[in-house]
Amino acid sequence: MGKKRLWALLAVIVSCLIPHGLAAETLKIASPIRGSWEGAIPELGKQAGIFRKYDLDLDILYTQGGGETLQVVMSGSVDIGLSAGVLGSLGAYGKGAPLRIVGASSTGSRETFWWVAAKSPLQSMREVDGQSIAYSTTGASSHITVLRFISEYGLKAKPVATGDVPSTITQVMSGQVDIGWSVAPFVLDLLSTGAARMIARASDIAAIREQTIRVQITSASNLAAKKDVIARYMKAYNETVDWMYSSPQAVPRYLAFSGLAEPAVRLMLREFIPRESLQTEKIMGLGESMKDAVQFKFLSTPLSDVQLKELIQVPAGS
């Protein structure tokens, strides 16, 4: 055998022995409200190749809100739940659920608001007297905010679970529910045409402005088995959020994914969802959340420092 043929054969053998890239690890993600900006983070990061850069592939399930997200995480159907309500998560852990918080999802809640059809006489949430007020699912951040409005404003109201935003729009416009909930950019088009009117934001409640209201969750067994994978996920997640606020490709991709109108999306970015609201590192306002959890009977007593340390395990550098 000639030297050239020998070297060629050796090159082929070596190339077969050296891996050309590890197979991506698949994570199952529960994301709320398909089409929302926050809920689109996994999908847009996947499209942009950011998660693949961290050897991750995402299998994304869309839920109708934080309550449903909590359920699918605890059932083991998914690895990570995005945007679960803080109080629902505290309550589940307090009742013995092997739950872990691995990052914040939303802080300040400027993007969540309540609205009425144009024909409604209501101009403000403080005027509510016996009307029905929508929230997504039990234990979700929208549910807790409705309870806060009722408590702080002394309202007589009927909280009603209406599911996701499209379902809520149908129920409000058909007269089944008096006051709808939404998260920007949904319903902003109805506000701009005068078909609907905003009567409150979650951030109208002072304590919520500095409070983390939604978190990312996993099960204790999943965190133990996939700690490194979840840490990589959180890094890729944050890199995706940075990309969404800096890349000229982000908004066009989001428009294609969500089917929403560009003016509403641009308004959302200007006035409703600043980059800092999507930080993941700190669970802010935890003391206030604990008080709320006890007041609204998600917890019978506050969690101890030892319990909080076990519950909240945000990966370093995420």
Residue map of PLM features:
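Short, glycine-/small- and polar/acidic-enriched structural segments
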Residues: 25-155, 159-162, 171-174, 178-184, ...
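Secondary-structure end/capping motifs
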Residues: 224-300
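Pocket-lining segment of extracytoplasmic ligand-binding domains
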Residues: 87, 166-256
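Bacterial N-terminal signal peptides that target proteins for export
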Residues: 1-9
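Conserved C-terminal helix/tail region of periplasmic/extracytoplasmic solute-binding proteins
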Residues: 293-318
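Soluble non-cytosolic domains of exported or imported proteins
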Residues: 36, 64-67, 136, 140-141, ...
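Bacterial N-terminal signal peptides
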Residues: 8-19
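Signal peptide processing junction and immediate N-terminal pro/mature segment
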Residues: 21-23
